[in-house]
Amino acid sequence: MTEFLFDGPKNADRTIVLAHGAGAPMDSDFMNVIASGLAKSGLRVARFEFPYMVKRREDGRRRPPDRAPVLLESYLQVVAELGPENLIIGGKSMGGRIASMVAGAAGVAVLVCLGYPFHPPGKPENSGPNISRPSGRRH
């Protein structure tokens, strides 16, 4: 069972799931500011941590992110626990990348990526994952 950090109204029409980036936890300053702003707009915000960050919180040791299969499964588990109906998924940097990789399989309609590198610096031809639904990018 995933431990969530919730912000916003419990009876919101939509919930947005936010995953942290590679180096900072779900309650980092950046994530707190974003969650607060989204909650003030009427969204319910659900933050969670990938397994490697849970371990870091338990023992204080920094470690690299889990391999992609673990991150993907973890995000899909979060979606299953909350239910994909009326769910927006996303995250900061690595968390956004993982969200973009599970969006189709998760059955969610909206994806939000914050601080997400859609392509390596100076290489726009190497764009991010193949997102098959209408999308817009705001830099």
Regions found by a protein language model. Give the residues of each.
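Short, structured coil segments at secondary-structure junctions
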Residues: 41, 106-107, 135
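The feature captures the conserved acid-bearing segment of alpha/beta-hydrolase catalytic domains
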Residues: 120-139
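Hydrolases whose catalytic domains are alpha/beta-hydrolase-1, hotdog thioesterase
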Residues: 98-102, 122
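Gly/Ala-rich beta-loop-alpha elbow adjacent to hydrolase catalytic centers
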Residues: 91-95, 99
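Conserved hydrolase catalytic core segment
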Residues: 101-110
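Serine-hydrolase catalytic machinery in alpha/beta-hydrolase-like enzymes
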Residues: 1-87
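Active-site nucleophile loop of the alpha/beta-hydrolase fold
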Residues: 50-51, 113-121
